[in-house]
Amino acid sequence: CELVDLALLFGERLTEKKREKNLLDFEDMEHLALQILLKEEENGQMVPSDTALEYREQFVEILIDEYQDSNLVQEFLLQSISGEDDGRFNRFMVGDVKQSIYKFRLARPELFLEKFATYQKEDGSCVRVDLKQNFRSRHEVTDCVNDLFLQLMHRELGGVEYDADAALYPAAQFPEADGE
């Protein structure tokens, strides 16, 4: 297919130009990190490298903010340095799938949704803590957001059902605004 050939040629030329100018983009750095932290076994399976295992021993916990914007490469990087395949669940992930904004960077909000669906609310090796209290906004704002998302967000559209568990509840007290 001509389009595929053109895309491959463009990729090769872009890589050449970046090498000539000693440039790396974010994606290049992710893939270089993969080469360092993963190795291929004889059977073709990718496993953590010795470097990844060294990091694994150093990291007691791995904190990830905005997890809903992670992509598969980042997930593989995190898996390589966390202890999950050793039975040590040491990742602390924070995110809100309703805020996923990096599809252009191949973000996979379904990674977040998978963990959201499988982690328990209490007890167990992987615990999910739902933060429903909003300390930033007045109730007029959270009420509006809740009403809008209740109408728009469904499992088929955003991967999450917007219900009482997903809603925001105002927790801060604000002084009354002038003109009310």
Question: What positions do the PLM features span?
Answer:
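Short helix-terminating capping/connector loops at secondary-structure junctions
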Residues: 56, 86-88, 122-126, 178-179
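Non-catalytic alpha-helical coupling and interface elements of nucleotide-dependent molecular machines
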Residues: 38, 64, 83, 117-121, ...
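Helicase-core coupling region on the C-terminal RecA-like lobe
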Residues: 130-180
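Conserved helicase NTPase motor core
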Residues: 1-114, 130-140
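Short, polar/flexible loop-turn hinges at active-site or ligand-entry regions and domain interfaces
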Residues: 19-21, 43-48, 101, 119-129, ...
